Amino acid sequence: MSGVRLNKYIASSGLCSRRKADELIEQGVVAVNGKVVKELGYLVQTKDKVFVNKKLIHPAKHLYYKFYKPAGYITTCEDEKGRKTIYDILPESLNNLKPVGRLDKDSTGLLILTNDGDLINELTHPSVKVPKIYIVTVNSAVHRKDLEQMANGVEIEPNKIAYADIQVLEIDNKHTEMQITLYQGMNRQIRKMFEYFGYEVKVLKRVQHATIRLDGLKRGDVKPLKPA
């Protein structure tokens, strides 16, 4: 019998990744034509109606955008503290898209936005070493031994070792500008690594995520991407 696997159908709606869809199915919150389905291999047919938490879902056309996040905005849909979010400046038509990863409030640069749950999972799962490239400026000259230690690993939190590939672009007594490549996804990783050695990050801009580059965008700009 032909059809689409239930987890793929749910993921194609933009609700979540296939992995998360499997969890929802196992939790018993997914129903097809009014009946709860817990079979992970269930095949959805053309005329079937699928509900998650009693809400009807539909497969959505996958959309992909790149966005130049300005400083001062957090990467979330809503904020309990009332801070500005990226959705305050994105076009309302893109409010259903989710960011691939995050940038903290004071950081700028590239965010990929999509409703493709599988892609989000693929690019953010800890087991996948996807390169993310940043231009970073700190408040003084960084010692060579500190750069070497960052390359070898720094324990920024208990049992959490952070690594970074660092290329120095400019250095003097008052600042160091670097290109930094990360393959991990730890919260505020770059800032914590430099704080560990007593440096203050003054500028942090992401310029590349996987193969997508920031090129051609000004702060606040958003541009559609063509699917691969």
Residue ranges and their predicted role:
Residues 1-228:
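Basic, flexible Lys/Arg- and Gly-enriched helix-loop patches that mediate nucleic-acid binding at interfaces
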